[in-house]
A protein has these predicted regions:
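S-adenosylmethionine
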Residues: 1-227
Length: 227
């Protein structure tokens, strides 16, 4: 049965809290993150013609009040003023505390939402290396960074091992959003639930551990890594 393994694991981990969790209303919230290279969040909120609420996850992000809105069609999106991003996805980049002038690596960067946040924090100073292992997704990454006005980024299409070999102990900050078993996609993608299994979880865990080793090799002593 689709999702049988996942439900069994949830029940085992949550116990009596499982029923409480699923009894609570759980509306899907969609969000956008403002590109600090284009404008300030306050300027964006004052300029757009659709409803927004401040996001609890990121100062540069907003929640959409209209679930039917298609922000990707807005002119400001095409101009790189904002990025359509899951609200929770706006969190990791901010944890690194990136500052202008630093050397930053986004090791699993495609399609580029978190990468654009790192770029905004750099303010055009320093170096941002963004890697996408799948060629087609690396192309999307490149396109998105161009749209967002990022000028100090190097986009790669390499294995994480080759990136680590090319940049030993080099980066001040590294973000690793490794491929995962996709539980966060279940509400939007029924196929993700159907494909979920213990074998997939084990496979993703092994891959994540390997990528994390490569990331550590590229981090300078005293640097900061967010996984």
């Amino acid at each position: 049965m689709p999702g049988e393994y996942f439900e069994a694991r949830e029940r085992a981990l949550l116990g009596t809290r499982y029923d409480v969790l699923y009894a609570a209303p759980c509306a899907v919230r969609r969000g956008v993150t403002v590109n600090g290279l284009r404008c300030a969040p306050q300027e964006f909120a004052a300029a757009v013609d659709f409803g927004l609420e401040p996001s609890p996850f990121c100062d540069a992000a907003f929640l959409l009040t209209d679930p039917q809105l298609r922000p990707g069609r807005h002119a400001y999106h095409h101009a790189g003023v904002f990025y359509v991003q899951e609200p929770s996805a706006s969190v990791p980049a901010g944890l690194l505390g990136v500052r202008p002038g630093e050397r930053v690596l986004d090791l699993c960067a495609a399609p580029g939402g978190k990468t654009s946040q790192l770029a905004a924090a750099l303010r055009g100073e320093g170096l941002l290396v963004a890697n996408g292992y799948v060629a087609a997704r690396a192309g999307v990454l490149k396109s998105n960074l161009e749209r967002m006005g990022v000028t100090n980024a190097l986009v790669l299409n390499e294995s994480t091992a080759r990136v680590a070999a090319a940049f030993p102990a080099f980066f001040d900050k590294i973000l690793v959003d490794a491929p995962c078993s996709g539980e966060g996609m279940f509400r939007k993608e029924p196929e993700a639930l159907r494909q979920h299994s213990a074998a997939l979880v084990a496979q993703c865990a092994a891959l994540g551990a390997s990528i994390l080793d490569d990331a550590a090799a590229a981090l300078r002593p005293g640097g900061l890594l967010c996984y």
